[in-house]
A protein has these predicted regions:
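Conserved P-loop NTPase "ATPase switch" module shared by AAA+ and STAND
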Residues: 161-192, 218
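Post-nucleotide-binding-loop coupling segment downstream of the phosphate-binding loop, primarily
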Residues: 103-169, 175-177
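Substrate-gripping "pore-loop 1 plus following alpha2 helix"
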Residues: 183-199, 227-231
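Hydrophobic, repeat-rich solenoid/adaptor surfaces of innate immune receptors and signaling proteins
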Residues: 84, 105-108, 113-118, 170-178, ...
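Sensor-1/coupling segment of RecA-like P-loop NTPase cores
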Residues: 199-229
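Extended hydrophobic
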Residues: 9-13, 32, 36-40, 45-55, ...
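Charged, amphipathic alpha-helical interface modules that flank catalytic cores or transmembrane segments
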Residues: 1-97, 105, 112-120, 124
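Conserved beta-strand position immediately N-terminal to the Walker
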Residues: 100
């Protein structure tokens, strides 16, 4: 009954429950027909608020803003968005109304999967929302988090109201970041669990299901008990999760992207470039130099970092200033346990930030 009250009312469950008891025990309703008007008037007097109405006009514009914020952070390869078979697996799961856990090592292309899902949702006009949990950290409870995101209710209830008769998709990315960046990660994960339960309950009432997509590094999914406990099935209402693992590029995929020169690379460099994030870095390196000795991700990043600093002079900036900016950012992230730094407290010049 608590879930049903939470579904219908935005006021605290205990307050609504007590109001129902008072209506039965204290009000003069014996022998009367209980109509919607009687209940509505009674709840208004008790200052109890109903939840959102279908197609609430406040929701869709805010969903678009949140999705735009999410997609701004995706950087494809220079050759463009590369279609991969794992994308088809994600789309198939969604068409079968299966909620998904996308896992993979860092840099393996999990964001490519979410980009493919978002493209599919837009093409098929499926209501959807995508959130990076390291930027929009869950806190307190679903209702409070939803308000902070700019919604009149929780994410689950909000998207339910704009998609009651069709499928909808909720993407929650960077689940593993809650473990590494938040001192109170248990609270954030509790909110995620509450959201899952809300979707489970809403789906019980829906013909077309809300589908949840979580994105998490394989290591954290397999080794963090708090994270993998989110997906354990314990009763009949529980969601059936499909885990889709993202791996490195196939050799022929990398060859097609790089071209004929790929055949001349050492085997270790070939394997290194099968990791999508490494290939992205390699594409931004000055091709006039030789990179045969780059055998680890660290080597690639070091080359790229030095190139960025070296070329800063062509933008009218001092190399020392760029080094100082990067050092300041890294120190802030290390001390705060965050993955980003607010611009207003960075004390970094506009020219350096733009560069």
């Amino acid at each position: 009954i608590n879930q049903y009250i939470q579904f219908l009312f935005s006021t605290k469950v205990e307050t609504v429950y007590n109001a129902f008891i008072s209506l039965i025990v204290k009000e003069d309703i014996f022998g009367q027909e209980i109509t919607q008007i009687i209940l509505t008037n009674y709840f208004q007097k008790q200052e109890i608020n109903f939840r959102l109405q279908d197609n609430d006009e406040r929701i869709s514009p805010r969903i678009q803003e949140i999705n735009q914020e999410y997609r701004e952070n995706f950087n494809p390869l220079l050759s463009g968005f590369v279609h991969r078979k794992v994308f088809d697996d994600c789309i198939e799961a969604i068409t079968n109304e299966k909620s998904i856990i996308i896992s993979g090592n860092a840099g393996y292309g999990k964001s490519g999967c979410t980009e493919a899902i978002l493209n599919y949702c837009e093409e098929e006009k499926i209501p959807h929302i995508a959130i990076k949990l390291d930027r929009r950290i869950p806190h307190k409870n679903c209702e409070s988090w939803g308000h902070d995101l700019g919604f009149p209710s929780s994410i689950a209830h909000s998207i339910h109201c704009v998609s009651r008769n069709e499928n909808a998709v909720i993407i929650l990315d960077q689940l593993d970041a809650l473990r590494w960046t938040q001192a109170n990660s248990s609270e954030a994960l509790t909110v995620c669990m509450e959201l899952i339960r809300q979707v489970e309950y809403l789906n019980y009432e829906r013909n077309k299901k809300i589908i949840i997509v979580f994105v998490c590094r394989t290591y954290d999914l397999e080794n963090d008990n708090n994270i993998n406990s989110l997906f354990k099935k314990q009763d009949t209402l529980k969601i059936d999760w499909k885990t889709i693992k993202v791996d490195v590029f196939e050799d022929d995929e990398v060859k097609e992207i790089i071209g004929k020169n790929y055949e001349n690379f050492l085997p270790k460099l070939k394997n290194l470039l099968r990791i999508p994030s490494n290939l992205y870095i390699w594409q931004h390196l000055d091709k006039k130099e030789v990179y045969e000795k780059c055998l680890t991700t660290y080597h690639l990043i070091d080359k790229w970092f030095k190139q960025i600093c070296r070329k800063s002079t062509t933008a009218g900036l001092q190399e020392r200033a760029i080094n100082e900016v990067i050092k300041r950012i890294v120190n802030f992230l290390d001390k705060t346990g965050r993955l980003y730094i607010p611009k207003q407290i960075s004390n970094i010049g506009e020219a350096e930030l733009d560069y």
